[in-house]
A protein has these predicted regions:
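Catalytic beta/alpha-barrel core
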Residues: 27, 49-50, 69-74
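C-terminal cap/substrate-recognition subdomain and adjoining C-terminal extension
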Residues: 55-155
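Non-catalytic pre-domain segments flanking phosphatase-related domains
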Residues: 1-18, 155
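Substrate-recognition element of Asp-dependent hydrolases with the DxDx(T/V) motif
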Residues: 23, 37-62
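Glycine-rich phosphate-binding "P-loop"
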Residues: 12-25, 66
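Short, acidic loop-to-helix structural element flanking the phosphoryl-transfer center
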Residues: 27-44, 78-79
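Short coil/turn segments at beta-strand junctions that form active-site/ligand-binding loops
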Residues: 14, 45, 90-92
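Catalytic phosphate/metal-binding cores of nucleic-acid and nucleotide-processing enzymes, i.e., regions
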Residues: 10-11, 40, 68
Length: 155
C-alpha cells in the first residue's frame, strides 16, 4: 500500500503488525470479523501478531488465519515489539496496538495505530500513535481505502 500524505513522507506499507489481546482479541477471544479480514488482505500484506499471549489462546484462535504469530517472553515486551518491527524494516510497517507494551512499536513503525476498544488503551500507546481508532475493523478500512489516511494525517 503506497499512500502520499501531504506534508509527510510517503507510506509504503507491506507488513501489518498487530498486538493480540485488546487489539485483535477481547479477553483472549478473537474479535468477530478479524480472521476474515486478515485472510482477505493477505495477498496484499504480510500479517504478523506479536503477543505475550496473556490467556494462552493465540495459537488456537489464529489457526487457519494467514498470519505469523510471534509469542514474546515476559520482561521488556515493549523493546521486543520494537525490535520485531525494526527487523521487518520499520519504514514498511503499520503497527497496531493498545497497551503500554505497544508504545515503542507504534512509535517506531512507519504508521502506528492505537485502538481504544473494550479493554481500553494505555495513554502511552495513544500518545505514541499517529492515528487512534475505535475498532480493529477500522484498520482494515484504511487498508481498503488508503485515502482515509490522507484525510486523517494531512498537514
Amino acid at each position: 500500500m503506497q499512500v502520499t500524505i501531504p506534508g509527510q513522507a510517503e507510506l509504503d506499507i507491506s507488513h501489518v503488525v498487530f498486538d493480540y489481546n485488546g487489539t485483535l482479541a477481547e479477553d483472549g477471544a478473537l474479535i468477530p470479523g478479524v480472521a476474515q479480514q486478515i485472510n482477505h488482505f493477505a495477498p496484499q500484506f504480510t500479517f504478523h501478531v506479536i503477543t505475550a499471549d496473556t490467556y494462552g489462546t493465540v495459537a488456537q484462535a489464529l489457526e487457519g488465519v494467514a498470519c505469523t504469530v510471534h509469542v514474546i517472553p515476559n520482561g521488556q515486551q515493549d523493546v521486543s515489539k520494537r525490535q520485531y518491527v525494526e527487523q521487518l524494516g520499520k519504514e514498511h510497517v503499520l503497527a497496531v496496538g493498545n497497551g503500554n507494551n505497544d508504545k515503542l512499536m507504534l512509535q517506531t513503525a512507519a504508521l502506528g495505530i492505537a485502538l481504544i476498544q473494550a479493554e481500553g488503551a494505555a495513554v502511552q500507546a495513544v500518545m505514541a500513535a499517529a492515528v487512534v481508532c475505535a475498532s480493529v475493523l477500522d484498520v482494515f478500512g484504511y487498508l481498503a481505502t488508503p485515502n482515509r489516511l490522507v484525510a486523517t494525517l494531512r498537514n
